[in-house]
């Protein structure tokens, strides 16, 4: 079997520094997994110099390799500039789903006692984003229009992934669109969720309108949840869910593309935070989300060795925090590299023990 190749999409400011920390953890010498890396410079300077051609090259590599990890990048404010690479990357790799999971971080107090993980499966295309918009009329007679669309194919992709993922993690599928008001438009998504529920009768399914989903989140603290959502709903809902756990540091963002059988074929992971320019060069930023992005990526390598490495990273990262080794944003005193060093030490130790027990 050939060695997995990961496309590394470099970024800006502290975002790049944290990617470097994640790559230290993904070192084959640490995780005992042979990997190849292909690097692409998506810094603002290089995107401008190449007129975004490097983004196209990076997307082609992610598609070819099936695996990619991306640092946070600067989005310039001038609309005539190169813009954000994120939407372009999602389009070029045919990303259909964005998965974000809120989870408890040791020593960080969540809101309202929320305990079990909550994953938001967000539609990555269609809906309100990318819709054509225009206005007609003048004064108080001016009217704005939007041409949103939902295709059954994309709705089925999101629904299928939602139930497969919920089955894998032992969670309940919870929530849904506002189909009672938008019977035709949002109703197509509800139809596909119901159909997926019928295909996976072993997965608990509690359909709710999106507004009820928000309201009931704080009352469902004991069950792990997977919440399917339309593009714009998922954008706002995932931000809320991550903050419910007290910090976005414990979450990674996973962009997924599927084949015609709804199996995952392309994965691009990243941290949900920005470039944090005020922290650049200070060695104080929290690398946890970026490290978890690397761990999440390994889950899709589909080998036992990769699964063990992924688990070791997740456990090592959280156990270090539980033992008081954490950066200042979580109430600790560890520097960025010190925390990463501790994660590496624990990952190596876990893999040593697990290998010994397998012998």
What positions do the PLM features span?
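Glycine-rich phosphate/diphosphate-binding loop of Rossmann-like nucleotide-binding domains
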Residues: 7-24, 28-30, 138-209, 223
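N-terminal beta-loop-helix "entrance" segment that forms/cooperates
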Residues: 32-56, 217
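Internal helix-turn-beta structural module
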Residues: 303-358
